[in-house]
Amino acid sequence: LSQHNPTAKIIVADPKPKFSKMALFQEGWNAHYAGMIDWIGSEFGGENVAVDPSAMTISIDGESINVDACNVIPAMKAGRIAALAGVTDGNWAPVNAADMSTKADADVYVLGDASQQGDMPKSGFSANSQAKVCANAVRGALTGSKIFPAKFANTCWSLINADDGVKVGATYKATDEKIAKVDGFISKTGETADI
C-alpha cells in the first residue's frame, strides 16, 4: 500500500485497550509506515464503532469517516455449536488444562480460540499445542496407554514489513485452575532487524 497509494490511511478501531506486541508494532509502523496507520483503542472510542456500507463510512465514537475499504472483525466468541452443547460461560468454553475437556462436560473437548483456558494467547500455534495435549489424553483414555503430563508452547512471528519481524512466545503448564505461563520471550523495542 505504501508503494501503490502512499497517501492511504489505515485506521484500526480496537475495542481493547492494548494488543499483543503493541509497542513493537507501533515502533515498526512508525519506522516503515509513518503517519499511515492509526490505532484507536477503547480509551479513544475504538469500542464505539458503527459501519454504514451503503455510504462507505465508519463512525468512531460519533465521528464519521469516509472509507475506500473496510474490514470489520466482530467481537470474538466460541462458535454456536459450543453454546448449543452447553459448554460455554459467556463468550468462551472453560476447559480443564490437563486434557482440554470442558468444565461443563468432561466428554466434550474444546481447544484453540473457543477455549477459555488461562494464560495462552489465541493463536494457531497455541491451538496446535492444545490439540496435542488433548489427543494424548483421549488416546490414553481410549487405549489405557500412558497419559503424559500436559505441556504447552506458543511462538508467534509477525512481519511488520518484508525485512522486519517481531516475535513472542512462551511455555506453559497445566494447573488445577488453568494453563499457566512458565516462561516466555518477546522481541525488544529498538532491536535491529538482523537479530
Q: What positions do the PLM features span?
A:
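A Rossmann-like FAD-binding core segment of flavoenzymes
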Residues: 2-91
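Solvent-exposed alpha-helices and their adjacent loops that cap or buttress functional pockets
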Residues: 4, 63, 101-102, 150
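Alpha-helical scaffold segments in soluble metabolic enzymes
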Residues: 28, 133, 137
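A structural signal for short hydrophobic beta-strand segments in well-ordered beta-sheet cores
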Residues: 47-51, 100, 158
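FAD-site-proximal beta/loop scaffold in flavoenzymes
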Residues: 64-129, 140
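C-terminal, flexible cofactor-proximal segment of oxidoreductases
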Residues: 138-195
